[in-house]
Amino acid sequence: VKPSGYFTTVYNADGSQELEKFVTSGSNRIYKTINEIPEDLQDAFVAIEDERFYKHNGIDLQGILRAGLVGITSGDFSEGASTITQQLIKNNVFPNFSQEKTFLDSVERKIQEQFLALELEKQMSKEEILENYMNTINLGQNTLGVQSAAKRYFNKDVSELSLSECTVIAGITQNPTRYDPVNNPDRKS
């Protein structure tokens, strides 16, 4: 589940930056290790995306029950229950999930994600899972990963982000189009 497709920068002979090019079509990713990512940003992602991340084994039964109850009582089954581990798998194993045609297709994928999440948690540490997730997450405008987001939205290295900048980047995951701080500056999460 390691991310693929990295961001490449081309330099002139004098060392100045010439242009940016993508190795993989549509990719915009600069990999950072977990030690290079601020703890505030890690904590913000966990708080927003999967508050029980350090307590579950890849699936969050409490979250699944909550989402199911909300779906049954409201008729709206859009409530999220995917863990960070499941989202990592979805981003890397099921990249075409948005093209699912039926609710049944979505349920089938979710079951596969849950099985794979349980298996992945046996093979990788929580830190490895979080590191890979933070390097694959779509943060708007096909900006993949936290380093690319730090560069795009704040023109700085991820390690230099302030607490408020960390919360803006983590908040983008809730709705990457709506909370894009470039196109919607008044809606910063």
Describe every region a protein language model picked out.
Residues 7, 11-188:
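Peptidoglycan glycan-strand catalytic modules in the bacterial/periplasmic cell-wall system
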Residues 1-5:
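Aromatic-capped interface at the extracytoplasmic side
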